[in-house]
């Protein structure tokens, strides 16, 4: 059976653990190597036991620990070519970096990882679907400016999903952010609102997803209760809904 946890989720850092049997992988490596090691340890996983890290995009909150993990643990790092080029420009140097097309499939132990494109203001942003040998799967998709067909297709056949619920539109518009930052977040390559997340969640449940986690919540423009209530109102009551903690592990499925 596949297990998935958000280690932490938000602008201060993002990382998720997916494991099945003896195989464990990370999706992103934000925050610090020590923070990731501590979070993994609380779940009974040692950092050197992680087989691979799959990077969604090059923004700091998703790669903060990447260079140190690659250097000290020698863990293989997988990224799209565009993201790999961006990592090189950010002086990430490592012989463990594996470059892939935007859409690719990679097997790691008894897990299979498939990427799909997402709309965000980065070099080549992707989400991931991870499945075990029985086909049990989880979809992980954050940092997207609008709902896209690639995401809706990717969720097909998954049992769980981690979806972005970044902001409440009214809180963002009336909040303290400068105009340029509000425009970026609300743009088609910005971040997904609670309302749009609810639409994705409703569709996901129609596909058969039974475990939903809300991630990448803005600390200034959202609250866990507001995100939860907005999405909860759109989905069946028997679907397990959780909000990812910013600083501690949260079980997704």
Name every feature range the model reports, one short phrase each.
Residues 5-15, 56-66, 84, 88, ...:
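Structured catalytic core of nucleotide-sugar glycosyltransferases
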Residues 81-135:
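Metallo-beta-lactamase
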Residues 64-73, 89-90, 222-229:
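Metal-dependent catalytic neighborhoods of phosphoester/phosphodiester hydrolases
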Residues 59-63, 84-86, 122-123, 146-149, ...:
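Active-site environment of divalent metal-dependent phosphoester hydrolases
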Residues 1-43, 126-143, 160:
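Conserved beta-strand hairpin/beta-sheet module of binuclear metal-dependent hydrolase folds
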Residues 149-245:
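Cap/insert and terminal regions of metallo-dependent hydrolase folds
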Residues 33-79:
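Active-site metal-binding motif and surrounding structural segment of the metallo-beta-lactamase
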């Amino acid at each position: 059976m596949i297990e998935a946890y958000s280690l932490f989720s938000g602008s201060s850092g993002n990382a998720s653990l997916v494991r099945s049997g003896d195989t464990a992988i990370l999706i992103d490596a934000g925050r610090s190597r020590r923070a990731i090691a501590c979070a993994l340890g609380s779940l009974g996983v040692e950092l050197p036991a992680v087989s691979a890290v799959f990077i969604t995009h090059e923004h700091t909150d998703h790669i903060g620990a990447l260079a140190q993990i690659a250097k000290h643990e020698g863990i293989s790092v997988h990224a799209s070519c565009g993201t790999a080029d961006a990592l090189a420009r950010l002086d990430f140097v490592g012989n463990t970096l594996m470059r892939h097309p935007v859409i690719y499939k990679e097997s790691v132990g008894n897990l299979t990882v498939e990427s799909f494109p997402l709309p965000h203001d980065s070099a080549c942003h992707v989400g991931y679907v991870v499945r075990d040998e029985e086909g049990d799967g989880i979809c992980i998709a954050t940092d997207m400016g609008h709902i896209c067909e690639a995401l809706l297709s990717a969720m097909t056949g998954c049992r769980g999903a981690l979806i972005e619920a970044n902001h409440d539109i009214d809180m963002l518009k009336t909040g303290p952010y400068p105009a340029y930052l509000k425009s970026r977040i609300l743009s088609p390559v910005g971040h997904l609102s609670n309302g749009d997340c609810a639409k994705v969640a409703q569709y996901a449940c129609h596909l058969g997803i039974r475990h939903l986690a809300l991630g990448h919540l803005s600390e200034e423009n959202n609250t866990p209760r507001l995100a939860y209530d907005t999405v909860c109102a759109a989905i069946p009551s028997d679907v397990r809904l959780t909000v990812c903690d910013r600083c501690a592990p949260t079980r997704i499925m």
